[in-house]
Structures are given as structure tokens and as C-alpha cells.
Design a protein with these regions (language model features):
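Conserved SAM-binding loop of SAM-dependent methyltransferases across substrates and taxa
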Residues: 204-213
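Conserved small/polar residues in nucleotide/adenosyl-binding loops
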Residues: 215-221
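Conserved class I S-adenosyl-L-methionine
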Residues: 193-199
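Short, flexible surface segments
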Residues: 6, 191-192
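Non-catalytic accessory regions of SAM-dependent methyltransferases
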Residues: 1-88
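Non-catalytic substrate-recognition/targeting regions of SAM-dependent transferases
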Residues: 74-85, 104-175
Length: 222
């Protein structure tokens, strides 16, 4: 089997010895190996990481409004354990895998370069690696600026609604970007209705209901 240190990139073989790809290994994790590539001969270096970042961004450009979106989504982009959300000109990073720790700042730098090629300048990067899942990887919680400090309240617009996102104190990376199309659906189904948005974090569903000329809306956080 060979020797390794938790977090190393290793080649994965099947029972017959056939190479299946490469990934991070961590004996302390319930996910023993997180796959980076299915090509065992592929070098995991800066060129590889840039390709992954570039592919992720190009895909987002063809599928979503990129003003605020999840640019890198872990395993879905073959960058396991890493999430990067873009809020206008701010990036928020969440790293949940030991193996990705060694590459996260390089990936952020590469992503800023890829965005710059499209005329997008990033004014700041904040890390929100403060989820409990980090402990399962043998990692401490981390929360703070990557690089220079900046104003961490970011104004975004989604589905015609304006929000002020607090990337330091907001839940997850500051905002639930994955609920975008559910919020948009509220504008259609709530027209002319009375709406109560219960157990809300930012009142986003109530705001989207309110944009469609409903009779009344209210929101409660508990």
C-alpha cells in the first residue's frame, strides 16, 4: 500500500490493481478518499487546479446569473471539500477537507485571475471554514480574511430583490444561494395571497412574495 500522510494525494486502484484515479486520503475521515481525477496519470499541480477552476467558471457562465452564485461546488467540480461563493465583488471560501487545505489559497488566487480575464475585479476574500464538519477531518474551525481586510457587508440583487449580505455573521457563507429559484417561484405562486414566512433567517421568501402584489406578508424568525 505504501506510506502516506493524511492529506496526501494518492493513486486509487481497484481490486485487480487497475488505476482508477487520484484523490486526497485522510484516515480520520468517514470519507477516506476524495477523488480529484479519474486519470491516474494526471499531475495534481497548479495547471490542474487552474483547469478545474476555469471549467467551473465557464459552466456557471452558461447556466446561472453570475453576479452572485456558487462558483465552486466541491465534488461537483472535482474540487472536493471546497466551496467558493461569489457575492458581486466578494468571494467567500469554505474548506471542509484536510487535503484541500494545502490548495485553497492557490485556488482562490487562480479564481481571481480567471475572473479578471472576464473583467471582474474581486475586492476581498473571506473564509468561513467554521462548520462542525471540519472536526471530522481533524481540522480546527477557521474564520477570517484571506488577504486584505474589507467591508464585509455586500449588497446583492437577486430576482429583482435587493439584499445586504453579511459574509462574517450570516449563516453558511452569508446567504442561501441555493434557494434562488425557490424564491423566484414565490413571486409566481403567491400573487394575490396572504403569506407568513416562518422561522426565517433573512425574510427572503417574504420579500419575494411581497414583490408580486400579494395582499399581506409577514415574517418571523422563531
Amino acid at each position: 500500500m505504501g506510506t502516506f500522510t493524511n492529506g496526501d494525494v494518492v493513486t486509487v486502484h481497484d481490486f485487480d490493481g487497475y488505476p482508477m484515479g487520484k484523490g486526497f486520503i485522510n484516515q480520520n475521515s468517514k470519507i477516506r478518499i476524495r477523488m480529484l481525477t479519474r486519470h491516474a496519470d494526471q499531475e495534481i499541480n497548479e495547471n490542474f487546479l487552474r483547469m478545474r477552476v476555469k471549467n467551473a467558471w465557464e459552466y456557471r457562465k452558461t447556466t446561472v446569473d453570475t453576479s452572485s452564485c456558487r462558483v465552486i461546488f466541491g465534488e461537483a467540480d472535482f474540487l472536493p471539500g471546497l466551496v467558493v461563493d461569489k457575492y458581486e465583488d466578494v468571494l467567500v471560501v469554505e474548506c471542509l477537507a484536510l487535503g484541500m487545505e494545502q490548495f485553497k489559497e492557490t485556488i482562490v488566487s487562480l479564481l481571481k485571475g480567471v475572473l479578471k480575464e472576464d473583467g471582474i475585479s474581486i475586492r476581498g476574500v473571506y473564509e468561513r471554514s467554521d462548520a462542525n464538519e471540519r472536526r471530522k477531518e481533524g481540522l480546527p474551525k477557521v474564520k477570517g480574511f484571506i488577504g486584505e481586510t474589507f467591508d464585509t457587508e455586500v449588497e446583492i440583487t437577486e430576482n429583482g430583490v435587493h439584499y445586504l449580505v453579511d459574509v462574517v455573521n450570516g449563516q453558511k457563507t452569508g446567504f442561501f444561494l441555493d434557494q434562488k429559484y425557490n424564491r423566484l417561484a414565490m413571486q409566481r405562486i403567491c400573487k394575490g395571497k396572504r403569506v407568513l414566512d416562518c422561522f426565517t433567517h433573512m425574510g427572503t421568501f417574504a420579500l419575494n412574495a411581497g414583490i408580486c402584489l400579494l395582499y399581506t406578508s409577514d415574517a418571523a424568525d422563531e
